[in-house]
Amino acid sequence: MENSLSLDLTKTKPYVEEHEIQYLESIIREMDNTLGKKTGPGNKFLGWMDLPINYNKEEFARIKKAAEKIKNTCDVFIVIGIGGSYLGSRAAIEMISNTFYNNLEKNQRRVPQIYFAGNNISSTYMADLLELVKDKDICVNVISKSGTTTEPAIAFRIFKELLEKKYGKEGAKERIFATTDVAKGALRTLADLEGYETFVIPDDVGGRFSVLTPVGLLPIAVSGIDVDEMMKGAADARQEYSSDNIEKNHVYRYVAVRNALYRKGKTTEMLVNFEPCLHYFGEWWKQLYGESEGKDGKGIFPAAADFSTDLHSMGQYIQEGLRNIFETFINVENPRKSIIIKEDKENLDGLNFLAEKDMDYVNHQALRGTVLAHNDGGVPAIVLNVPELSAYYFGQLVYFFEKACGISGYLQGVNPFDQPGVEAYKKNMFALLGKPGYEDMKATLEERLK
């Protein structure tokens, strides 16, 4: 096993003391046992727990084969999905690939350009994307359990039409890959009818926990990331976080501290990074915790920030605003690349004290200074140390946060594996759009909106 993630809770004191963590050990162990024995709420959606070792090896091989086909066939790869159907793969690709991967020349990329669609309903976004890719060789991966989720369904209808006009029906079917339910749903029916190659979203894995299934694996493999290493990282994390000793299990300690802080009125957790490539990891994390914990009038509100950028916008609030915040810093110990700051003879900017230092050294001092400043201002700080940004550690991070999320949800007395609240806006939208069966509701809503 390679070096693992490590957790530094020094700057959560004096807000949470060690004895408070110890007091929570038995209840956290009980919640973990509930997960493991599959006796708690949402127990039909716990397939993610053993996924790193129990994944479908035959399908995994097909995914890698399909990824090679896409890389050899297409200039552009369009990933159509929303929420858990795209955030995990985008988080991995942005974290591990070149920051400007889509702008590199093809011989530098060695993989297609990758764009995401179906995660909004903006006509401008879609029109701009079509304008960008229409004259290029295109492959599409449409990801939807049902095939009727509005945003990806609209996007796929548009791209299906484009590909069929461009390549004909036979040519299009060779370039469309569907990730969907094993047997039912509109997308499964369409894929079988048209003859698309398909990959299965497991019945026992919910969308926000699905990045290590074909949902995330195909786009990640197309990007050139080593999915074997990613699964190895997740498998090693699964083994490491199986300990029921809170002194040894970082998941237990993270769950204990964030919930102790929540009980003391720290109701907002900010996941903070100092690497721009972690932005979409924060977006993935927000969905994971927001949908899992935010119900029954409870839950820690998940927010994310990109430092040092957001220190120049949100820094004032974090330092001196309402004291309901705690932060979880992702500290990347070793950057992918280095840049040395050179000496300037004139030194008009006064930066020669940084001469011959790596930019990453400056970045780390910014992180350390921020932790101290915010802590002095009444904001507890959890620091999660990550040795490097690689496929292996992406797998570790995913499993760390997924397991912590499941335990934490049970600790808060909610079902962390459902999301009943997301249907409310959809019903209103369908009624306002005039979907059949919503006529009475439409009239009521239109009256309320006057």
From Swiss-Prot:
Keyword Isomerase part of the UniProt annotation: yes
PROSITE patterns tied to this protein: P_GLUCOSE_ISOMERASE_1, P_GLUCOSE_ISOMERASE_3
HAMAP family on file: G6P_isomerase (MF_00473)
Gene Ontology biological-process annotations: gluconeogenesis; glucose 6-phosphate metabolic process; glycolytic process
UniProt keyword annotations, A-Z: Cytoplasm, Gluconeogenesis, Glycolysis, Isomerase
Record function comment: Catalyzes the reversible isomerization of glucose-6-phosphate to fructose-6-phosphate.
The protein's annotated pathway: Carbohydrate biosynthesis; gluconeogenesis; Carbohydrate degradation; glycolysis; D-glyceraldehyde 3-phosphate and glycerone phosphate from D-glucose: step 2/4
Matching NCBIfam families: PRK14097.1
Name under which the protein is recorded: Glucose-6-phosphate isomerase
A GO molecular function held by the record: carbohydrate derivative binding
Subcellular location(s) per record: Cytoplasm
Principal location: cytoplasm
Catalytic site positions: 291, 312, 426
Any one GO CC term of the record: cytosol
Enzyme Commission designation: 5.3.1.9
InterPro entries tied to this protein: G6P_Isomerase (IPR001672), Phosphoglucose_isomerase_CS (IPR018189), SIS_dom_sf (IPR046348), SIS_PGI_1 (IPR035476), SIS_PGI_2 (IPR035482)
Keyword Cytoplasm: yes
Reactions catalysed according to its record: alpha-D-glucose 6-phosphate = beta-D-fructose 6-phosphate
Family membership: Belongs to the GPI family.
